[in-house]
Amino acid sequence: MSTLFQALQAEKNADDVSVHVKTISTEDLPKDGVLIKVAYSGINYKDGLAGKAGGNIVREYPLILGIDAAGTVVSSNDPRFAEGDEVIATSYELGVSRDGGLSEYASVPGDWLVPLPQNLSLKEAMVYGTAGFTAALSVHRLEQNGLSPEKGSVLVTGATGGVGGIAVSMLNKRGYDVVASTGNREAADYLKQLGASEVISREDVYDGTLKALSKQQWQGAVDPVGGKQLASLLSKIQYGGSVAVSGLTGGGEVPATVYPFILRGVSLLGIDSVYCPMDVRAAVWERMSSDLKPDQLLTIVDREVSLEETPGALKDILQNRIQGRVIVKL
């Protein structure tokens, strides 16, 4: 039996993209997925790009937006999931080439679903969303590569964003001395509330000049920024340290030299939260419900919005008017 529901749909008209709340039937959703009643979704920078012309995210219009969703299984042909199961969906092709999670119902392939860990609520899962998973995967990879609290401080760039803010909180929970870098000087108190022991400006990381090697300052870094700032911070990582890079808000080109790698043994770790293998994905989500779960997780929430308020929030995230995470209650 079909059900009518509300969803945030992007449509393309000539060279323009418009985003509106539409009434849609479950009959119109893909038939090859697990049908989920969505409780919460979240807004990521990628969602903002998907809702604008020239964003180069959406493959084909019209499309329901939203790369994240958390909710309860309504029906399933997949033996791994049954009616009533609580699940999380992040990334893959959700909200890119397949109808996404900014919707009261979503149809998601079972291969893309993670069972909700016991110590996590559906709301908390979307406070995390793709941003939180990216932060957790960054910390996970850094620790696999030798990061440990006794070796020195850890830098987090873009710290007022979703990935950066959650990374600050997670690292603090793990006992690290966290240095948060931001372009927003007024955010110092907020970042210290999240767990930063020191807040520095982005100019302290990259002052406009690039050196092959600089004074060693941090044992590692979580970097969702990229660009010249990444090139600069690589030159300041301690011997044997690592940088986990997950974004390019500072640019896609990194004008670095090989010297940090060949003279200091620095490692550059690529963080892909979109197609991360399911065994790693599930293991990291378990950590997000336990040793990586910040005591102050909800502090990262900038606002909670309705579906009708979501188009405005999508514009805000592209214009850097959001500090932390925006979650959407369906």
Swiss-Prot record:
EC number: 1.6.5.-
Gene3D superfamilies referenced in this protein's UniProt entry, alphabetically: Medium-chain alcohol dehydrogenases, catalytic domain, NAD(P)-binding Rossmann-like Domain
One GO CC term, this protein: cytoplasm
Record-linked InterPro entries: Acrylyl-CoA_reductase_AcuI, ADH-like_C, ADH-like_N, GroES-like_sf, NAD(P)-bd_dom_sf, PKS_ER, Zn-ADH-like_protein
A Pfam cross-reference name: ADH_zinc_N
Alphabetized GO MF terms: acryloyl-CoA reductase (NADPH) activity
Cellular localization per UniProt: Cytoplasm
Enzyme class: oxidoreductase
PANTHER family (UniProt xref): ACRYLYL-COA REDUCTASE ACUI-RELATED (PTHR43677:SF1), SHORT-CHAIN DEHYDROGENASE/REDUCTASE (PTHR43677)
Protein name in UniProt: Putative quinone oxidoreductase YhfP
